[in-house]
Regions:
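Metal-dependent phosphoesterase signature
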Residues: 1-37, 47
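Asp-based, Mg2+/Mn2+-dependent phosphohydrolase catalytic module
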Residues: 19, 40-43, 56-57, 61-161
Length: 161
């Protein structure tokens, strides 16, 4: 929205956007190449998987149910009265719903907001360079950066027998 827009105009436009996205969230949305196979490999190793998103809760759950049925154990999107990332609230909720401790969690993301979220939650983090932001934006967080799903899987599973 342009600077100086009246708050009521901004609110109406945002509400219209949210309705449109909820109705059209599948349009032009696909998993990145290699993601389904990597997730299957993690599930085969017994990993519990969760999604934490700043997208609205309903579309996030619809996307995950459509593209990854039965893969994720917890899916949390943006909801009223829950602070959005980089606040750690949704991460804590997800980790708790999985019956895990934050020290067992690995947060994977593709943006500076994700790096901040992991730091705020106090959990390990791996960032990926193929998503929302490029490598340069991710470097300041000091966590591993994966350039492919194969590299991400290797980072996640190193040390496993």
């Amino acid at each position: 929205m342009p600077d100086g827009c009246a708050p009521d105009v901004t609110d109406r436009v945002f509400a219209a956007f949210k309705r449109h996205y909820a109705e059209n969230c599948m349009v032009l949305t696909r998993p990145y190449p290699g993601i389904p196979e990597m997730l299957d490999a993690l599930k085969a190793r017994g990993w519990q998987l969760g999604v934490v998103s700043n997208k609205a809760d309903e579309p996030v759950k619809a996307l995950i149910a459509h593209y990854f049925p039965g893969v994720f154990d917890s899916v949390v999107g943006e909801r009223e009265n829950v602070r959005k990332k980089p606040a750690p609230d949704s991460v804590f909720e997800t980790v708790g719903s999985l019956g895990c401790d934050i020290g067992q969690a690995v947060y994977i993301g593709d943006s500076d907001v994700d790096g901040q979220t992991a730091a705020n939650a106090g959990c390990d983090c791996i960032l990926v360079a193929w998503g929302f932001r490029g490598r340069e934006t991710l470097l300041p967080f000091g966590c591993p950066i994966a350039d492919s799903t194969d590299e991400l899987l290797n980072i996640l599973t190193e040390g496993e027998k």
